[in-house]
């Protein structure tokens, strides 16, 4: 892998814990903690399951969006939900019909719905909006039934590429994110092509295809270096800008590859989903596991603060993302 220096920690993780150094436990913990941070530093408006149930019983103007990928939505979701993965929310909403609506976003738990809500703010959609607190897990904990065997209609969504490009440029300037149009031959970078569920675009050789929100909420499966440049390309410009904004908030050196994403000599192993070992029955209707998982998510930021890091990431309200630093540097400097 061309690393110049590598080391093995003597005594493995047990010795690490013995010295009371920071120690992660859980599932995609870094990304999950980041999601909790966004809720703390933004003005997230929560809607609770009982309130949503009441809304369902009357005529309303809410577009209720499950922001998970299509595959997850089709396993289970909520009554009245439509599906649009978080990275494609801006282009999905940016049309006359959907701009007349108000929005309720949800996932199975917390992280992706928090990201979706903040994204609606980032892209200047001023409509009334809410996060369903705790997602499908809290829905079940509140005594309501999920909807199974759903069929996503995301392929029927229409994209106005001119409007989307205009929106992407505007938001990129707003957050001062870096961009490039150079045909890079450098293979010592991370190259991601954002996978679209709305339209099948041609794969670019040497670029790893990944769902935008999956990349954000399970970053440790895709990016192992905290200071390597990360090029992001999408045939839907707003999806690329979405991804760059979120990666830079997390402290990664993400750059919008605005055009000229060329073929490169690079291969990847297939990224497989990990088995669910952590509160494994939380999506199977087990209330104890659902409650345990949601409580674990709430514990993440207090744990980081115990390590002496009061501001692990930038605030969700910060507009200037031209300079970023990974939170691991902020945490470890205290030890």
Model-derived features with residue positions:
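Rhodanese-like catalytic fold shared by cysteine-dependent sulfurtransferases
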Residues: 1-63, 67-188, 195-335
């Amino acid at each position: 892998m061309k690393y110049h220096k590598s080391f093995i920690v003597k005594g493995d993780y047990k010795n690490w814990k013995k010295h009371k150094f920071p120690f992660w436990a859980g599932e995609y913990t870094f990304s999950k903690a980041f999601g909790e941070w966004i809720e703390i530093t933004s003005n997230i408006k929560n809607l609770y399951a009982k309130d949503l149930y009441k809304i369902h019983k009357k005529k309303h103007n809410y577009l209720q969006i499950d922001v998970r990928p299509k595959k997850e939505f089709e396993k289970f979701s909520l009554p009245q939900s439509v599906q649009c993965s978080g990275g494609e929310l801006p282009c999905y909403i940016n049309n006359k019909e959907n701009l007349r609506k108000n929005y309720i976003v949800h996932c199975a738990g917390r992280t992706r719905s928090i990201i979706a809500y903040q994204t609606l703010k980032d892209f200047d959609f001023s409509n009334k909006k809410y996060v369903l607190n705790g997602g499908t897990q809290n829905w079940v904990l509140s005594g309501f039934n999920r909807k199974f065997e759903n069929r996503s209609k995301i392929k029927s969504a229409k994209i106005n590429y001119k409007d989307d490009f205009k929106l992407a440029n505007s938001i990129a300037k707003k957050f001062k994110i870096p961009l490039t149009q150079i045909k890079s031959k450098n293979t010592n970078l991370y190259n991601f092509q954002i996978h679209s569920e709305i339209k099948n675009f041609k794969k670019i050789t040497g670029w790893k295809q990944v769902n935008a929100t999956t990349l954000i909420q399970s970053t440790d499966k895709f990016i192992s270096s905290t200071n390597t440049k990360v090029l992001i390309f999408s045939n839907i410009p707003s999806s690329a800008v979405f991804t760059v904004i979120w990666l830079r908030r997390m402290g990664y050196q993400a750059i919008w590859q605005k055009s000229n994403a060329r073929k490169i000599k690079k291969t990847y192993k297939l990224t497989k989903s990990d088995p669910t070992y952590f509160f494994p029955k939380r999506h199977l209707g087990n209330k104890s596991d659902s409650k345990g998982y949601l409580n674990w998510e709430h514990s993440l930021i207090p744990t980081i603060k115990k390590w002496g890091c009061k501001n692990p990431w930038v605030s969700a309200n910060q507009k200037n993302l031209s300079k970023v630093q990974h939170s691991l540097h902020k945490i470890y400097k205290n030890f």
